Amino acid sequence: LSKKINQKNIVIDIQGVIIVEFVFVFFITAFFIKILLSVTEYYSTIGKLDRISYSLVGIVRERTRLYNDNNELTQIQVNQIKQLADSMLVNSRSTETDLAIKIETIHFDHTESSAIEDRHIDNTKSFSFNTGVCEPKKPLSELTQLSSFSHAGRWIPLYQVTLCLPATPWYSALFNREGNITPIKSSSIAIER
């Protein structure tokens, strides 16, 4: 009824089990580290885009000083701002270079009334320019409630800069619940001084 057990076979079998366990633990640990590095890189990219979009919306807001009191946004200005954004992104050691940008401005018709009903968008001065495919989560035309009536007797113009970088499928799988690949976005809004 009893079987003879060879001591040498037990030692070999244990070593085989240890190697198999080591391989599983190694791959699980490597996968966990890959996820942590990806999450870190994703949020680092969002932080870079946030800083760049905030800087650019400040430039758009102050462009009357940069462009000789010209308050109307043009495609040439947007292309220059896009080049600046590309330069800022490269200087932040980002590997992505396929940056898309959308700049929106909203100006309001002159009125003496601070009533919200009298706040109307001036379509001759309100513009939206794209370089690449990039759409904000909320267009600036839906955020007009952020404008306030100034002491100078006018509604204050609004500016929005949205930056988009294409997301790798790895990011999309981790951070996107909708299933389709969406870019990493950052939007900044400013009011005129």
In which residue ranges do the predicted regions lie?
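Short, conserved structural patches
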Residues: 54, 62-193
